[in-house]
Amino acid sequence: DRSSAASDVYKRQVLGDEQTSEYFPILKGKRIAIFSNHTGMVGDKHLLDILLENKFNVVAIFSPEHGFRGDADAGEHVSSSVDKKTGVPILSLYDGKDKKPSEASMRKFDILVIDIQDVGLRFYTYYITMCRLMDACAEYNRKVLLLDRPNPNGHYVDGPILDMKYKSGVGWLPIPIVHGMTLGELALMVNGERWLPASRVCDLTVIPCKNYTHQTKYTLPIPPSPN
């Protein structure tokens, strides 16, 4: 009925990374890598800091275009380093074959945690990096845990589907320009449709948002790219 639908609108959305009781047990005793950047905030703290405070063994960070703290320019080569605040090593996403992490990097961890804000556009590069990491995790038998976030453009779908002969670093899947999905939904679709190279399937767990529908308005608390 209309009144309960209206009240749902006012329920606060609970993001995947806020649901620590759902995913802390999954991470116990594991060597953890995270794929995140400056948008991976749980309230006013970064996911990395929360995991370290709770004595989890975070061994590596993968960071996308713009760098882990979000301060590099688009397309600028972000070299491997360490996160100055925590000392956790930042590994290159591209030091292996096919623009994927190297085998040495993949052997460092047991589970990859993804927490990053996407905007639901085909040419936005974060989902492409996610797919490459899913592919590497499938190849090396690593688990993936995705902490989902709302899509600020999740209320509509628009534009043609990519002709895969034009697959590139700014368009990687046969999806419309505005695809309407959260990263978690997209990751599940990638697995379900066997879109990874060689039809690989990744061992994937998604912690979905609570109180989120595709009609729910979501205002980004932090700009997803610095430019």
Regions found by a protein language model. Name each.
Residues 167-227:
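Conserved anion/nucleotide-ligand pocket segment
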